[in-house]
From Swiss-Prot:
The lineage of its organism: Archaea, Thermoproteota, Thermoprotei, Sulfolobales, Sulfolobaceae. GO terms for biological process: glutaminyl-tRNAGln biosynthesis via transamidation; regulation of translational fidelity; translation. It is an enzyme of class 6 (ligase). It holds the Pfam family GatC. Residues 63-77 have a biased composition (Basic and acidic residues). It catalyses: L-glutamyl-tRNA(Gln) + L-glutamine + ATP + H2O = L-glutaminyl-tRNA(Gln) + L-glutamate + ADP + phosphate + H(+); L-aspartyl-tRNA(Asn) + L-glutamine + ATP + H2O = L-asparaginyl-tRNA(Asn) + L-glutamate + ADP + phosphate + 2 H(+). This is Aspartyl/glutamyl-tRNA(Asn/Gln) amidotransferase subunit C. Keywords: ATP-binding, Ligase, Nucleotide-binding, Protein biosynthesis. Its EC number is 6.3.5.-.
């Protein structure tokens, strides 16, 4: 799949990111994204048919067993929370006022 990097894509990314870029920044971002995509296209051209898969140095990951356990009750869950309201945790605003 070929991604076309153009002004419309940059504007779309600005909207998704909730940022505004100057024309100079837009042009720089367009060039950067184009270079990144070209780099990945070069990687995709590599012939890896004779390359063996990598191994992990440890026989098993350091993840804990996922064993079910009883959840915290509401009182204990809210015990150390700074901001709570009506039994819910109040987080910081992320957008708007």
């Amino acid at each position: 799949m070929k991604i076309e990097v153009n002004k419309n894509l940059i504007k779309h990314l600005e909207n998704l990111s909730l940022i505004q870029l100057s024309q100079n920044e837009e042009k720089m971002l367009e060039n950067d994204i184009t270079n990144i995509i070209k780099f990945f296209e070069k990687i995709n051209e590599l012939d890896l048919s004779n390359v063996e898969p990598l191994f992990h140095p440890l026989p098993q990951g350091r993840l804990r067993k996922d064993t079910p356990r009883d959840p915290l009750d509401r009182e204990n869950a809210l015990k150390n929370v700074k901001r709570k309201e009506n039994g819910y945790i109040v987080g910081p605003r992320t957008y708007g006022e």
